């Protein structure tokens, strides 16, 4: 009897392992799809990210689940669902491993962006500063530049145009050093709103973050 129970346990464990691997592969495929559609179809990206997140248990930390949830929140904020996005970002924190500094910084950066959309600029700047510090500590210059650009956008909407320009210039300097053409274009677009220290208020488009 004891031998039969051991055999049954081995069979169950053997059956569970491939299923877990299949779920992980499926989650990664869904995450890839979410990233693909994020900017041109955020509604579809939100769907894929939510499906990926649902593959994981609610009570277990998982960096892959955290990645899916961050994508979901990013898609929802692009859709204008800021309250839903910020709620889920807070829920995401428990799935991030304490040693994964990059993922925590990504979370803080996105939270800062959403708080900015909600008009809470003090909280937005606090989170942006935290994200910037973490990215600096791990040597991720590209993400530091991204934080500077987002910070510039925040100050633009606070009508602090001189400060905004300074952060856009910092982002541009990093992106030029790395020859990141896409982000250079974004920085230059934002800087085109300015002439020296004077904001071109007439018919100027909003800066991009």
Residue ranges and their predicted role:
Residues 19-70:
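N-terminal leader/linker segments that initiate helical-solenoid repeat arrays
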Residues 31, 38, 67-78, 106-117, ...:
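Conserved alpha-helical positions within TPR/SEL1-like repeat arrays
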Residues 49, 56-57, 95-97, 115, ...:
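Eukaryotic all-alpha helical interaction scaffolds
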Residues 58-61, 97-100, 137-140, 176-180:
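Short coil/turn linkers that connect adjacent helices within long alpha-helical scaffolds
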Residues 202-209:
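Conserved small/polar residues in nucleotide/adenosyl-binding loops
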